Amino acid sequence: MQVSELFKQSNTILLDGGMGTMLQAAGLKLGARPEELNITDPQLIEGIHAQYAAAGSRIINANTFGASAHKLAGSAYSLEEIIAAGIANCKRACAPYGALAALDVGPLGELLEPNGTLAFEDAVEEYARIVRAGAAAGADLIFFETFTDLYELKAALLAARENSSLPILASMSFEAGGRTFTGCTVESFGVTARGLGASAVGINCSLGPKEIFPMAKRLTEAVPGNFPVFVKPNAGLPRADGSGYDITPQLFALEMKPYRELNLFAAGGCCGTTPEFIRLLNGVFKGCVPGRPAHAMPSVLCTPMNYVNVDGITVVGERINPTGKKRFQQALRENDMNYVLEQAVSQVEAGAQVLDVNVGAPGVDEPALMPQVVKALQSVVSLPLQLDSSNVQALENGLRVYNGKPFVNSTNGEPEKLKAILPLCKKYGAAIVGLAIDERGILPAAEDRVAIARRITEAALEAGIPREDIYIDCLTLTASAQQKDVLATVQALEACKKELGVRTILGVSNISFGLPCRPYLNTTFLTMAMYAGLDLAIMNPSSEEMMAAVYAYNVLTNRDEQSMQYIERYANRVPASTALKQAAQAAPTAAASDGSAEISGPYAALIKAVEKGLKGDAAAQTRALLAEKQPLEVVDEALIPALDIVGAKYEKGTLFLPQLLQAASAAQSAFEEIKTAIAQKGEGSASKGRIVLATVKGDVHDIGKNIVKVILENYGFEVIDLGRDVPVETVVDTVREKDVHLVGLSALMTTTLKSMEETIAALHAAQLDCKIMVGGAVLTPEYAEKIGADWYAKDAKRSADIAKEFFGV
């Protein structure tokens, strides 16, 4: 098969299975780098590839999954040498069978900012180095797999597109709840990866065929029918005794049969699968034609955790905009991100579904500030952002660091503007707002604005931007100055909707500028526009009149089925007059955004700041409280309860890892203020308990352990972090010498479960007075009990609960 024929096959292509599984069976030593075998034992690697090719695999992944600078640190061979050898081995095995050799690329092994310390552009450059090495070695395509962070996958996709012309298969790993480790949804992955230039998208690892199937079905619905989708499930789930996976090749083939109805581009296996698994897939997918019937693609905007389908009236919060706001302009000039974040959080709480982001102000370096604001916002709120600027460089800088499918506001009918903006939108997979204005200015007649909108639409389509990603703004003029042109906007909007088949958007509040009682005019104009076909309303979500109009309109037009959203928002509302009386008498409160009980009293503001991840607010509120309260009182009455609230939401699945880490970061900023106050009083800061953490011998994965460390430290525990690939004797010696009574051990690979068992046995044999909690992707509660652990910690929150229980705090 030639690369040019890759996506023209008349039958579902078979991928390969687990390389690690085969290497373990061949006696891979604990702690050895599998990728070094490309050079030290090429016959072994080539032989495994050949077995998969003989079984029917037509895309074979080279043994390069962990070939990154971070994971190869300390190796005797360079990244380029290992990749070149890996591709050469793979191509030799592929040649007799006409199979293609893929550069296999996995995660770097480090968390990206803001969840970790790896800068986005550093990640792009590291992936670029990998891609360049693979392309130079003659790889036929690139296979990104087992990603759990959409931001890291974006870095990888940009690196691939900017440094090669090879086809790209992109895959993420999802947990049983349908989200990745970092909270990314299946739909957000599919939409974002497709927009960034992936040639095909898929799901691999983590789960077996039965568990992955509903997610794979969702993925096929998130992309066009002719867009390639693939799967590589595990051989079921790990056995409780750590001896492998629980599905036989025959059962795997049986559980893969339902995938025929998805008309996949390709299918294979991941952990636990062997050439026999792949051989049996030949019969499963015989005669299965890739591609699904065409279906209408929704207009969507997304972040990893928040997927907004623009169906019904969607509210775009307008408050992150310095126009006419002196305090906002000052905040931008002073780089006061805390003020910007406060504006964002308040709009989220008011019900905005998208946030407009404009940082253009006098005295501001907009190209430098836009990416800073985008990153700051995305560290705290999960709503999609609309990047609002007339500065092309500012837009590109913001688009590059945006995590998800972005939204650009805007281009217009001027040829030079279209030429500058549309390629950016195409490169970064962004939706685009087209203003119905050109070099002649805003034309009063509706038909003239429609003509401009048509030119914009045609240009966008020609640039490769799909129709569902085109939004036309027919421009709201002020009724005070251009009253006779108000209806022209509504008429043009209606015509664009009907004639061009695009989405529509308006900055609603402009209508009332310069007139009294603005909410009356805004709400009435909004209602007129909605009836004419408005899709997105840029407005102030804190305007109760306007929000009520939106929710009511969605009910009356049957967009809000069974009035569920309306009921959720208004069922417990009280009349305005009563609400005012209650507000006047009420103490400060912190309301949880998920509808949980309000927290009142002097600590409410600090609790809210931690919950929302507002580091600046958390520090300021802590300083204010310390003027009246004792430091430990602030910890016990505010910080620990705040972390408990966040942890409870994390367990319920209403909040995800990035928010958990940002809340921990906000709590840390508060703790720093408390430490300073204690030091000024000449007192010591008492630890709530000392804990040793370690990733066991032979395992180089430490992301999970590092997250546990952050959470434990924010609960006031002292953590002795021994790092990764930690020898058994190091753990035992540290526990003895430091007099530690609680140990946390982590393992991510089935091959290192034996190391965990040996470490626990050594701790017991040394008769040390300590308890042990264990965690990691391959562990189960049953296996944890079997190897002598005292607790199984499924995540960081559970680790904190165990520590609190053990130390009695």
Question: Which role fits each region the language model picked out?
Answer:
Residues 1-473, 477-809:
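Domain-level signal for soluble alpha/beta catalytic cores
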